[in-house]
Amino acid sequence: MKKTSLVLSLCLLLSGCGAQTQLSNDGKVASCINIETDQSKNIGTKLKCLDGKSSVLLESIKGPTLINIWGSWCAPCRQELPLLRSAYRSGKVKIIGIDVDEPNTQSGKDFAIKAGITWPNLEDPSGKTKSAFGMGVPVTWFLNSDGVVTYKHIGIFSSSAQLETEIKKYL
């Protein structure tokens, strides 16, 4: 009986740790070091990583990946976050966020940490990407394996089924 209780307790403890780890960002903004880029591209829009340690040329990002444009002040962006977190945790899709129009970098960092955003994020404090992405947020771009935009989803994803369908169709 004691052995069964011990095994059951251990299983519950381990399953709880796994779930928490998947949502945790350890109180830090995710690094951009693993964003894959095409080094032959050197002209375009350079954005700093939200962690402040590097920058990425937007036009050099390789796919397949989702580029999700968001702002901490954007209620619809917050609404779709659980769907994006679930898709990212599944390991079936890479996501890169672009935080736009924040009053300051710290606002974006604080939001990313509090919201459990564990994928890399770039920042666009001046809104210079609006000409490429459009005026509103959220907007999600789908880049195929060649880094070519295959689809632009404007607005929030209404369900995980919708997001999964678009991932399968456009990546």
What do the PLM-derived regions correspond to, one by one?
Residues 113-117, 123-171:
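Thiol/disulfide oxidoreductase modules built on the thioredoxin-like
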Residues 1-48, 162-165, 171:
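N-terminal targeting signals for export/organelle localization
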Residues 66-67, 95, 140:
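Hydrophobic beta-strand anchors of alpha/beta hydrolase catalytic cores
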Residues 63-64, 92-94, 118-119:
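Loop/turn elements at helix/coil->beta-strand transitions in domains of secreted/extracellular proteins
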Residues 44-65:
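A short beta-strand-turn-helix
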Residues 63-65, 70-73, 136:
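Short pre-active-site segment immediately N-terminal to redox-active cysteine/selenocysteine motifs
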Residues 78-115, 125-131:
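Structural microenvironment flanking redox-active thiols in thiol-disulfide oxidoreductases
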